[in-house]
Regions:
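Surface-exposed peri-terminal alpha-helical interaction modules
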Residues: 1-171
Length: 171
């Protein structure tokens, strides 16, 4: 998303984004060669790469907020990308120790992915031609539903502070 959304004048960031694409493609290629003897080293390398990508995206948000760069993505959309990277770093923190990540409460995932889904539904709506009235209505409805589900998840996650992890509203 970032590479194709940067203004052509953002040459340095375009180059960095292309470098990240190439680097992560290389990591993906290495997945087929993983075994018990190299998986931890690989995971540590991935973690380091993800941290660099996170820093790059945060620098874009910072410069976007201060009007020092031009990109066709909102700071909020990029922030959602950072949230995804942080979730991946959480998973990697277990994998690099040879541990299986725990199963987090479903609301943990709702708080990450519902806001992301809403952003994607909104982006789809924004890219649809105005003559696609039915599709735009459906997309707008999806956006609203995801936003409503997210707000509900925020409140339900607050209920978890009672140490009750299952209650009727979660069904």
């Amino acid at each position: 998303f970032i590479h194709d959304s940067l203004y052509p004048s953002e040459k340095e960031d375009i180059s960095k984004a292309a470098s990240f694409i190439h680097h992560f493609d290389q990591l993906l290629y290495q997945v087929n060669t993983l075994n018990e003897s190299n998986v931890i080293i690989f995971t540590n390398n991935v973690e380091e790469s993800v941290k660099h990508l996170r820093a790059f995206k945060l620098s874009i948000i910072e410069r976007h907020l201060t009007s020092e760069m031009k990109i066709h993505l909102t700071p909020t959309f990029i922030n959602h990308m950072v949230n995804e990277l942080e979730e991946y770093l959480l998973i990697l923190s277990y994998l690099k120790q040879g541990k299986t990540p725990p199963i987090f409460h479903e609301l943990h995932h709702h708080l990450i992915w519902l806001v992301d889904a809403s952003g994607h539904a909104g982006a789809i709506n924004d890219r649809l031609d105005g003559v696609e009235k039915r599709l735009k209505e459906k997309s707008s409805t999806f956006t609203k539903h995801f936003e409503q589900f997210y707000l509900k998840a925020v409140e339900l996650a607050g209920y978890l502070r009672t140490n009750i992890h299952k209650f009727p509203a979660l069904k």
